[in-house]
Amino acid sequence: MSQSETFEKVKKIVIEQLSVENPDTVTPEASFANDLQADSLDTVELVMALEEEFDIEIPDEAAEKITTVQAAVDXIN
């Protein structure tokens, strides 16, 4: 799967999980906490949704570093 395909799938999950009203705010640089108003529970649930969608397991240590949309894409690829 290409980087752009992964980004589009991650973007879709982020929009659903965080109830993002304006999809244009979900950019690679968008911070879950600062730009998308996600709290720590939202982030945990988001990582779980990504693990399920991509059929992967993200170790806790790596999950803590997923703070932006691009970081999520990088962890998956």
From Swiss-Prot:
Compartments reported by the entry: Cytoplasm
Domain of life: Bacteria
UniProt GO MF annotations: acyl binding; acyl carrier activity
PTM-bearing positions, type O-(pantetheine 4'-phosphoryl)serine: 40
GO aspect biological process, one term: lipid A biosynthetic process
Entry comment on modification after translation: 4'-phosphopantetheine is transferred from CoA to a specific serine of apo-ACP by AcpS. This modification is essential for activity because fatty acids are bound in thioester linkage to the sulfhydryl of the prosthetic group.
Pfam families recorded: PP-binding (PF00550)
Principal subcellular localization: cytoplasm
Domain Carrier: 4-77
Keyword Lipid metabolism carried by entry: yes
Keyword Endoplasmic reticulum: no
Cellular component annotations (GO), alphabetically ordered: cytosol; membrane
Protein keywords: Cytoplasm, Fatty acid biosynthesis, Fatty acid metabolism, Lipid biosynthesis, Lipid metabolism, Phosphopantetheine, Phosphoprotein
Pathway(s) it belongs to: Lipid metabolism; fatty acid biosynthesis
Function: Carrier of the growing fatty acid chain in fatty acid biosynthesis.
Family: Belongs to the acyl carrier protein (ACP) family.
The protein's name: Acyl carrier protein
Species this protein is from: Anabaena variabilis
